[in-house]
Amino acid sequence: ARERHLQAPENIWNTIHQGYMPRLYEQTVNWDIYYASYVSTYIERDVRQLTQINSISDFTRFMVAIAARSGELLNYSSVAQDVGVSIDTIKRWTGILQTSGIVYLLQPYSNNHLKRAIKTPKIYMLDTGLMAWLTKWLTPETIQQGAKNGQFFESFVVSEIIKSFYNHGMEPPIYFYRDTNQKEIDLLIEYDKTIYPIEIKVTANPTKKMAKAFELLHQLPHNELSIAHGTIINQYPQKLWLAENLVALPIAYL
């Protein structure tokens, strides 16, 4: 993105809340009514074509449970407990959301040199407007000021990056890293034998310490992969170099 296109931070929260559905940008369309109709039609028409569901309310509850976990490690057992159906059913339903482009399963980065990496994927909602409607965050202001603002911010950034690859006809070469010591890197983009580490922070005061986990990447063999400078995507309104190999970028650069 170019400097003149940067959005003010409050506009980002409007976009996060509004979501991606083009019709929502027509002034006459009510956000709440639109998403209620969208979910109802999606389950009645699309889901029922793909699988047998006994209860629309169960599937709606499932979508709410997934939306509430956007950006978290996918724990099928926990979701099954919330919804009151079997783990196998949750796995099947998650596959349907994937096929429909409603969620994305972000795989953990795998490399023999990073021994402690966990192997569970994370799940992300690809439309933060739908995520907000399902979890009843009804205005941009409540999202921005609420306890889940980091979750919405991260989901928005990840979905924007995923869509940018899709728009170029590419399968996103993106991963995350977390290990058994709770060290984590939000996103790793592996492209042309180069790793691009990204941290996503809702803060407007980015610091070098926020990217400390990037040091783990030095364990990777330099003859196989090169490590690009790290990036912290955040709410500070300008591009800011925090170190020679670390830049903080405004979310509006996406």
What is each of the regions a protein language model found here?
Residues 1, 235-254:
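Domain-level recognition of nuclease-like catalytic cores that cleave nucleotide substrates
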Residues 1-23:
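Amphipathic alpha-helical segments of the small helical/lid subdomains adjacent to P-loop NTPase cores
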Residues 25-195:
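Accessory nucleic acid-recognition modules appended to NTPase machines
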Residues 133, 207-209, 239-243:
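Switch/connector loops and helix/strand junctions flanking conserved nucleotide-binding motifs
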Residues 166-167, 215-226:
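Arginine/glycine-rich "motif VI" loop of SF2 helicases in the C-terminal RecA-like domain
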Residues 203-220:
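Mg2+/Mn2+-dependent nuclease catalytic core
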Residues 226-234:
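Short, hydrophobic beta-strand segments that form beta-sheet elements in well-ordered domains
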